[in-house]
Curated annotation (Swiss-Prot):
Glycans are attached at N75, N186, N296, N330, N381, N391, N432. Cu cation 2 binds at H81, H124, H534. Cu cation 1 binds at H79, H473. PANTHER family: LACCASE-13, MULTI-COPPER OXIDASE. It catalyses: 4 hydroquinone + O2 = 4 benzosemiquinone + 2 H2O. It is found in: Secreted, Extracellular space, Apoplast. GO terms for biological process: lignin catabolic process. It comes from Arabidopsis thaliana (Mouse-ear cress). Mostly expressed in roots. Also detected in leaves, stems and flowers but not in siliques. Keywords: Apoplast, Copper, Glycoprotein, Lignin degradation, Metal-binding, Oxidoreductase, Repeat, Secreted, Signal. Cu cation 3 binds at H126, H475, H532. Belongs to the multicopper oxidase family. This is Laccase-13. Cu cation 4 binds at H470, C533, H538.
C-alpha cells in the first residue's frame, strides 16, 4: 500500500485539476470597423469591433469554445498560435491546411482544451494578410490546484503588450499589389503597441498608452510580436528585464536590457520599478537582418510611476531619447546573444534516438519571367519574388483543405506526399550561390511522419537573394532548440555541441541569417500540421510545407472526427 501512495497522490491531483477546469464560451464577430490611426480613418477588419481583438484568459486545463461569425467581405480562419490541439487539427485554423475558410456570412465554432500549457500565447487570422488587424492575446494561467508562477519573485501586476504593424491603407490591397507585380510588398507605415503607434508618429501622441506602476513593484510584461513582417527589438528605458518564459514555456531566468522577438514569438519578462519616479518609454523598433527595405520607425508606450505627479520638460526630453538605446536595426550580434541565453529551467526529455533526420534549406528565390520588366515582373531584374523549403515553393490548395482531403482519403488534386527530406542539390548554402539554383519548383507537398517518431530538423538559411532570420513556426507542436550556428551546418562537427540537457522549448524559432538552427520533437500529435516562416510575405511566396503525422495504434492516438460545422470549400 505504501508503494501506491505516489500513484494515488498523482490521481488526486489529476482529478482536482479536472474539477477546477472551466469551459469558456466566446463569440467572435469578424466585421469591418472604422479605425483612426495616423490622422486617417480606415475600415479595418476586426473582431467584435476591437483593435486589437479580445484577450482570452484561461487556466491550464480549461477549454475554449469560440464561435467565429464572418460578417466581413473576405474569407477568414482563426489560428490559436502555440496551442498544440492534441488530436484536434480541426481547431488549428490555417486556411486550406486544416480547414476551408469561413466564407462571408458563414460561421464555425472552434473547440479546444489547454493541455499542460501555461504562459503567453496569442490568436490571429490565418487567411492572407487579415492578421494585420485580426489578432489578440491568449493568456494561460497556472491551474487553481497550483496557481503560482515558478518565478524567482512574485509579480504585483501584469501588462500584456501586443507589438504590431500598421499600414495607412488596406493591408489586403498591399498584398494584392505585391502578388500582381511580383515585387516586395510596401513596408508598413507604423509599428504599434496594443494598436497605438505612440508619441513619435503624427496624430498619435494623445492616444499613447500609459501603464501605471508603483515604486518598488514587480511587473510581469507579456510581450507578443504580432507584427506581420518584421522582427522587433523591445526595451524599457533605464529598466532591466528578467526573462522568465518564451512561447508559453518557462525558461531559466536571465537579465537583459533588450529582447528580440520574431513575428509569432512571445516573451515574458519581469520588470522591477526601481528607478526614480518619472515617465519611461517602452519602445520597439525593427531588427532587420536582410538586405531589404524596412520600416525604420519606433513605436512607444509609457511606463508611468504613480508617484510621478507630472512630467517635467527635462524628463520628457530624456524619455524621447530612449529609443536610441535600442540596438541598431541590423544588430545581429545582439539578437543572437539574446536567443542564445534561452534555456529550460531544468533538465528536459530531449529525443535522443532520431528516426527522422531532416535537413531543410529555407530562403527566398526568384522566378524568371518570359517577358521581364512587365507589370507582373517587377521583382529584381524583371523577375518575381518567391520563397521555398528544399527548393519547393508551397502552393496552397483551393478545392479542399489538406487535412480534410487526407481524412477523406481523397488527396488526388489536393496534395502529394513527396516533400523532399533534404534539398535536391547540395551546394554552399551561405556562399555565392549559382543563379541556376535561385528558381524553385512549385508544389503542394507534404512529408509523412510515423506516430511517435523522433524527429530532428536542421533549418539552414541560404544566401539566395539575401540571408535572413526566418522565424519558423510549427503548428501542433512545441520543439526543443538543441543547437544553432553560423555558416553551413556540418553534421560531423556541429552535432557534438548540441544542448541535450536543458534546451529551450519553443513553437517559433529564427534561423540565424547565414546560419542554421536544429530542433527536435516527438511526432505524437496526429494530423496535418503546417510549418512556415511567420513573415507573412514569405509564406505567401511559398516558404512553407506540411507534416502529415499518421495515427497511432493505441488508445487516444488517432485524429478526432471532424465537427459537423467544419466549413467546406
Amino acid at each position: 500500500m505504501e508503494q501506491l501512495r505516489p500513484f494515488f497522490l498523482l490521481l488526486a491531483i489529476f482529478v482536482a485539476s479536472l474539477v477546477n477546469a472551466e469551459v469558456h464560451f466566446h463569440e467572435f464577430v469578424i466585421q469591418e470597423t472604422p479605425v483612426k490611426r495616423l490622422c486617417r480613418v480606415h475600415n479595418s477588419i476586426t473582431v467584435n469591433g476591437q483593435f486589437p481583438g479580445p484577450t482570452l484568459e484561461v487556466r491550464n486545463g480549461d477549454s475554449l469554445v469560440i464561435t467565429a461569425i464572418n460578417k466581413a467581405r473576405y474569407n477568414i480562419s482563426l489560428h490559436w498560435h502555440g496551442i498544440r490541439q492534441m488530436r484536434n487539427p480541426w481547431a488549428d485554423g490555417p486556411e486550406y491546411i486544416t480547414q476551408c475558410p469561413i466564407q462571408p456570412g458563414g460561421s464555425y465554432t472552434y473547440r479546444f482544451t489547454m493541455e499542460d500549457q501555461e504562459g503567453t500565447l496569442w490568436w490571429h487570422a490565418h487567411s492572407r494578410w487579415l492578421r494585420a488587424t485580426v489578432y489578440g492575446a491568449l493568456i494561460i494561467r497556472p491551474p487553481l490546484s497550483s496557481p503560482h508562477y515558478p518565478f524567482p519573485v512574485i509579480p504585483k501586476r501584469e501588462i500584456t503588450l501586443l507589438l504590431g504593424e500598421w499600414w495607412d491603407r488596406n493591408p489586403m490591397d498591399v498584398l494584392n499589389l505585391a502578388q500582381f507585380t511580383g515585387a516586395a510588398p510596401n513596408i508598413s507605415d507604423a509599428f504599434t503597441i496594443n494598436g497605438q503607434p505612440g508619441d513619435l508618429y503624427r496624430c498619435s501622441s494623445q492616444e499613447t498608452l500609459r501603464f501605471l506602476v508603483g515604486s518598488g513593484e514587480i511587473v510581469l510584461l507579456r510581450v507578443i510580436n504580432s507584427a506581420l513582417n518584421q522582427e522587433l527589438f523591445f526595451g524599457v528605458a533605464n529598466h532591466k528585464l528578467t526573462v522568465v518564459a518564451a512561447d508559453a514555456s518557462y525558461t531559466k531566468p536571465f537579465s537583459t536590457n533588450v529582447i528580440m522577438l520574431g513575428p509569432g514569438q512571445t516573451t515574458d519578462v519581469l520588470l522591477t520599478a526601481d528607478q526614480p519616479p518619472a515617465h519611461y518609454y517602452m519602445a520597439a523598433h525593427a531588427y532587420n537582418s536582410a538586405n531589404a527595405a524596412f520600416d525604420n520607425t519606433t513605436t512607444t508606450a509609457i511606463l508611468k510611476y504613480k508617484d510621478a505627479s507630472c512630467v517635467t520638460l527635462q524628463a520628457k526630453s530624456q524619455a524621447r531619447a530612449i529609443p536610441a538605446q535600442l540596438p541598431g536595426f541590423n544588430d545581429t550580434a545582439t539578437a543572437a546573444a539574446f536567443t542564445a541565453q534561452m534555456k529550460s529551467p531544468s533538465k528536459v526529455k530531449v529525443p535522443l534516438e532520431i528516426d527522422e533526420n531532416l535537413f531543410f534549406t529555407v530562403g527566398l528565390g526568384l522566378f524568371n519571367c518570359p517577358t521581364p520588366n512587365t507589370q507582373r515582373c517587377q521583382g529584381p531584374n524583371g523577375t518575381r519574388f518567391t520563397a521555398s523549403i528544399n527548393n519547393v515553393s508551397f502552393v496552397f490548395p483551393k478545392q479542399n483543405s489538406i487535412m480534410q482531403a487526407y481524412y477523406q482519403g481523397t488527396p488526388t488534386g489536393v496534395f502529394t506526399t513527396d516533400f523532399p527530406p533534404t534539398p535536391p542539390v547540395t551546394f554552399d548554402y551561405t556562399g555565392n550561390v549559382s543563379r541556376g539554383l535561385w528558381q524553385p519548383t512549385r508544389g503542394t507537398k507534404a512529408y509523412k511522419l510515423k506516430f511517435n517518431s523522433q524527429v530532428q530538423i536542421i533549418l539552414q538559411d541560404t544566401s539566395i537573394v539575401t540571408t535572413e532570420n526566418h522565424p519558423m513556426h510549427l503548428h501542433g507542436y512545441e520543439f526543443y532548440v538543441v543547437g544553432t550556428g553560423v555558416g553551413n551546418f556540418n553534421p560531423n562537427t556541429d552535432t557534438s555541441s548540441f544542448n541535450l540537457i536543458d534546451p529551450p522549448r519553443r513553437n517559433t524559432i529564427g534561423t540565424p541569417p547565414g546560419g542554421w538552427v536544429a530542433i527536435r520533437f516527438v511526432a505524437n500529435n496526429p494530423g496535418a500540421w503546417l510549418m512556415h516562416c511567420h513573415i507573412d510575405s514569405h509564406i505567401f511566396w511559398g516558404l512553407a510545407m506540411v507534416f502529415l503525422v499518421e495515427n497511432g495504434e493505441g488508445h487516444l492516438q488517432s485524429v478526432q472526427s471532424p465537427p459537423l460545422d467544419l466549413p467546406q470549400c
